Amino acid sequence: MKMSYNKLWKLLIDKNMKKSDLRKNAGISSSSLAKLGKDENVTTEVLAKICNELKYDVGDIMEFIPDESK
């Protein structure tokens, strides 16, 4: 199962917030931000920090993409 963080990027655009601002304000590393940009797995701690900063739920910033092979 894949994850997509497209919802997060759309929220940042709506809030007129740069990725670097999110990184600093949420206290996440640049490597975590890079993983998000590649739709790779990140820890729940990273997701919690982002949700806390943006005041959104985890379902508002990411979605699961079902495997097509099933």
Residue ranges and their predicted role:
Residues E40-N52:
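Short, basic-rich loop-to-helix N-cap that marks the start of a DNA-contacting helix
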Residues L12, R23, G37, C51:
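The alpha-helix within a helix-turn-helix
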Residues N16-A34:
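Short alpha-helical DNA-recognition segment
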Residues W9, S20, A34, A48, ...:
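Residues within the helices of the helix-turn-helix
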Residues K2, K10-L11, K35, M62-K70:
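Short, charged recognition helix plus adjacent turn
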Residues M1-S20:
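A short, Lys/Arg-rich alpha-helix, primarily the initiator
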